[in-house]
Structure formats: C-alpha cells, structure tokens
Regions:
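A metal-dependent hydrolase metal-coordination microenvironment
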Residues: 1-120
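Conserved acidic, metal-coordinating active-site core of Asp-based
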Residues: 123
Length: 123
C-alpha cells in the first residue's frame, strides 16, 4: 500500500494547488493522502480511487530544560480533523498573527530600502 500523509499545498509552503496534488497522487497510484499544511486545514474534494485523510501540521515549542529559556521546536501532524473543530478556529487566529508579523517584517525591510510588496507574500 503506497500512501503519503505529509503533503503541503500552496496554502502552506508547497508549490501545487490542492487539485493538482490529488491528480498527481492518482497518477502515482497512491491509495491514501493527507494534505498537512502548516496551521491550515485543507480539505480536498473526495475522489474515487484514493482515500483523503484530513490533516494539519502544527508548530510547537517547549522549554527543553525547565526554567532555562532554551526552547526546541517540533512540528506535529494531526489527522482526522473536522473543518469546524475548536482547534481550527485557534489555528486561524495563529495564521492571522503570522500574517501581521509578516507585514511588520516587510515594513521594516522597506525602511531599510529593501523593497518588497505585501502582494508578493501571496505568490
């Protein structure tokens, strides 16, 4: 059984649209896939010939030595989420904070004469 349960689309840091991913998976004769975008629940349309498992990748940090302020980061893969689950609302808030952070970075770069438009973030 060939499966791929860790795929990113253009909704995250991947390069393919969701429909393209599903088409490629069918061409590769994968039996199951999960699109696990960062902090974004991508739910492709169901298709005959392939099982699509809802998934998401979430970033997390923890204090590796209690009280030391030394943190390690990990990415957690979560499967079988529903679109309206409580975690998806929380992750939407995280995405919005990241968007605002990126806009602030662009403003600071522009002040240093490194010209980047906010619209370039969507590419």
């Amino acid at each position: 059984m060939a499966i791929d349960l860790h795929i990113h689309s253009i909704n995250s840091d991947g390069t393919d649209a969701v429909d393209e991913i599903v088409e490629k998976a069918l061409e590769m004769e994968l039996e199951a896939i999960s699109i696990t975008d960062h902090e974004y629940l991508t739910i492709p349309k169901k298709r005959d010939g392939i099982e699509i498992i809802n998934g998401i990748e979430v970033s997390a940090n923890w204090d590796t030595v209690e009280g030391s302020n030394v943190f390690a980061g990990i990415h957690l893969l979560i499967y079988f989420l529903e679109e309206l689950s409580p975690i998806t609302k929380h992750l939407e808030n995280i995405r919005n904070l990241k968007i605002e952070r990126n806009k602030e970075i662009i403003r600071k770069l522009n002040k240093e004469n490194i010209k980047i438009e906010e619209s370039e973030l969507d590419k």
